[in-house]
Curated annotation (Swiss-Prot):
Disulfide bonds: none annotated. One of its GO terms (biological process) is base-excision repair. Binds 3 Zn(2+) ions. It comes from Actinobacillus pleuropneumoniae serotype 3 (strain JL03). Zn(2+) 2 binds at residues 145, 179, 216, 261. This is Probable endonuclease 4. One of its GO terms (molecular function) is DNA binding.
Length: 280
C-alpha cells in the first residue's frame, strides 16, 4: 500500500500537524517538531504529546508513516569542534522529541564539509554523530536524506550514503530518504520510466532498498545535474511525471511515507489524488 502525504505545518502545536494532514487527504505526513530555524526550543508539554498520539491513533497514522524533519541549522559533519558539538546536541534533542511523540524516524540532511575537511572525513563525522545519537536515544531511526549537492553539502551521491551507513554501528538505526528533486539536481536521471529503473537499480546496488525509509516527491525548477535545490510542483518543472508513475507502480516504495514538499500547499490535495490515480 502507498502512504502519501505532505510536509504540513505544526503551527500552534505539533498535534495540529495531524489535523492538517487529514485535511489534505493524506495517510502519511512530515513535520517539524520545533522551529526549524532555531537551535533550542521549549520542551514538548505532556498534554501536547498526549494530543499528538491521540490524534494519530484517531486518524490511523502509524509511526512508520510519519517523517519528522530536524532543524536546518544542524550540520553533523561540521569541521569545527564547537559547532559540531552544538549540532550533535541539537540532533539528540530532535531524536528525543521524536521518541517522546512515539515516532520511529527522524529525517535529516547529512552535513557539509565547508571546504575545511575532506569528503571522507566529513562522512566519518556524520556517521560518528549518528552513532552518538542512537546510543543516547532509543527507538528512533536516523534517516539520511540525499541532497542536491549544493555548496559543500554531501549526500548527493549514493556512495556518500553508503559510506555513512557502513560506519554506523547499529544498522537497524539508520535509513535513507530519497528526495526526487535532489536526485535529479544531483545528476540522477528520473525523467523517464527507463531512467528511473536505472537510477533505482543503482541505488539498490550501492545502498540497498532495505534502508529506504521514506521519500520526498518533488518536481524541480532546475535541469538535470544542476546541483541547485529548487523544488517545483509535481506536474511542472524539468523532471516530468514518469517518476511519479514509476514510484506509484513499484512495490519497493510500499509502506513508507511518500511526502510532498512541492511549492504550492494549496494543491497538495490534488497532487495526492493525482498520485493515487497512478497506482496499480
Amino acid at each position: 500500500m502507498k502512504y502519501i502525504g505532505a510536509h504540513v505545518s505544526a503551527s500552534g502545536g505539533v498535534e495540529n500537524a495531524v489535523l492538517r494532514a487529514v485535511e489534505i487527504g493524506a495517510n502519511a505526513f512530515a513535520l517539524f517538531t520545533k522551529n526549524q530555524r532555531q537551535w533550542k526550543a521549549p520542551a514538548l508539554k505532556a498534554d501536547t504529546i498526549e494530543k499528538f498520539k491521540r490524534f494519530c491513533k484517531a486518524h490511523q497514522f502509524s509511526p512508520e508513516h510519519i517523517l519528522p524533519h530536524d532543524s536546518y541549522l544542524i550540520n553533523l559533519g561540521n569541521p569545527e569542534a564547537e559547532n559540531l558539538a552544538k549540532s550533535r546536541e541539537a540532533f539528540i534533542d530532535e531524536m528525543e522529541r521524536a521518541n517522546q511523540l512515539g515516532l520511529k524516524l527522524l529525517n535529516f540532511h547529512p552535513g557539509a564539509h565547508l571546504n575545511k575537511i575532506s569528503e571522507s572525513e566529513c562522512l566519518a563525522r556524520i556517521a560518528e554523530s549518528i552513532n552518538i545519537a542512537v546510543d543516547k536515544v532509543p527507538n528512533v531511526i536516523a534517516v539520511i536524506e540525499n541532497t542536491a549537492g549544493q555548496g559543500s553539502n554531501l549526500g548527493y551521491r549514493f556512495e556518500h550514503l553508503a559510506e555513512i551507513i557502513d560506519q554506523v554501528e547499529d544498522k537497524n538505526r539508520v535509513g535513507v530518504c530519497l528526495d526526487t528533486c535532489h536526485l535529479f539536481s544531483a545528476g540522477y536521471d528520473i525523467s523517464s520510466l527507463e531512467s528511473c529503473e536505472q537510477t533505482f537499480s543503482e541505488f539498490e546496488r550501492t545502498v540497498g532498498f532495505q534502508y529506504l525509509r521514506g521519500m520526498h516527491l518533488n518536481g524541480s525548477k532546475t535541469p538535470l545535474g544542476s546541483r541547485v535545490d529548487r523544488h517545483h510542483t509535481l506536474r511542472e518543472g524539468t523532471i516530468g511525471t514518469d517518476f511519479c508513475k514509476f514510484i506509484m507502480q513499484d512495490d519497493r516504495f510500499d509502506n513508507i511515507p511518500l511526502i510532498l514538499e512541492t511549492i504550492q500547499p494549496e494543491i497538495w490535495t490534488e497532487e495526492i489524488k493525482f498520485l493515487r490515480t497512478l497506482a496499480k
